[in-house]
Amino acid sequence: MENQENERIKKAFQNKNWPEIKSSDSWNIFKIMAEFVDGYETLSKIGPCVSVFGSARTKPGTKYYEMATEIGQKLASVGLGVITGGGPGIMEAGNLGAHKEKGASVGLNIELPFEQSSNPYIDRDKLINFNFFFVRKVMFMKYAQGFI
């Protein structure tokens, strides 16, 4: 398993010459478009939400983790969904709060080598995995009525 992961990472960072890099860009448009469509179709059905941003390194039991959980609960209690980056820390806490109130708990996860998987408090039908940061950022902005 570790060997496969190492090979995947090596392949991602292979040296390519300039024409190879540029010619592959034109085909990426289809991957980018697919991520936009997936995001639009999923998020347009959820209703009003607030995007919650914060550190992935904040641990459960700390002051800021507890505050983010409380914020998620309060948002969900007034009918607002919570959108986070889907990871641990403040993101997890915001999703946990929404989950406790049975509100919409959305995760916009990014697929990166060495990064976390999504947290367990995201509604599985509201988890979207992205490969492109800029598409993910659009979703944070387009479907939020507020930002924390």
Model-found features: residue ranges?
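Charged, compositionally biased N-terminal leader segments and the immediate start
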Residues: M1-E2
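Glycine-rich beta-alpha loop segments
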Residues: E5-N6, N15-L108, Q116-S117
